[in-house]
Amino acid sequence: MSEEKLKKKSFEIQRIYIRDASFEAPNTPNIFHKKWDPEIKFNLSTVSKKLKPNIFETNLQVRVIVKSEENLVFLCDVHQVGIFFISCLDEQELKHCLGSYCPNILFPYARTCISSLVSYGSFPQLNLSPIDFDDIFCKNLKSKRNNFYQKENI
């Protein structure tokens, strides 16, 4: 690794891969004959960790649960992971990069995987909207600050 690379702010994608993907449609084939009135629940979370100096892993976990008339139609989980080289960022910049920028890179891959799994399950196409990870990161940061101050004031 070049010395110059370690002395300036740098970001590189080293690898993007699926760690885990699952699709469950426990009520098939009967669910295909029922009225289609989907209720979609969507959850996501990220976990990041340092693997080596300047090498970080971000795991974006996306879960979609679809019910129709109280019946589980399908459940889809995807853990989309990226390994990134990141150098010369201060602590706050690194947190922002791992909590917002990296998940933003990973989400289109996870969305494509989920869409494919749903299609292969013979269900109508599921197009997940883009996510504003920057907004989520800022809200979580603000919430953590508020919780910290509330605990300090007790």
From Swiss-Prot:
Highest taxon of the lineage: Bacteria
GO biological process, any: protein tetramerization
Gene name of the encoded protein: secB
Function summary: One of the proteins required for the normal export of preproteins out of the cell cytoplasm. It is a molecular chaperone that binds to a subset of precursor proteins, maintaining them in a translocation-competent state. It also specifically binds to its receptor SecA.
Gene Ontology molecular functions: unfolded protein binding
InterPro entries: SecB, SecB-like_sf
Protein name (Swiss-Prot/TrEMBL): Protein-export protein SecB
Family in the record: Belongs to the SecB family.
NCBIfam families in the cross-refs: PRK05751.1-4, secB
Cellular component, GO, one term: cytoplasm
Keywords, in A-Z order: Chaperone, Cytoplasm, Protein transport, Translocation, Transport
Record localization: Cytoplasm
Keyword Nucleotide-binding: no
Pfam families to which the protein is assigned, alphabetical: SecB (PF02556)
SUBUNIT field: Homotetramer, a dimer of dimers. One homotetramer interacts with 1 SecA dimer.
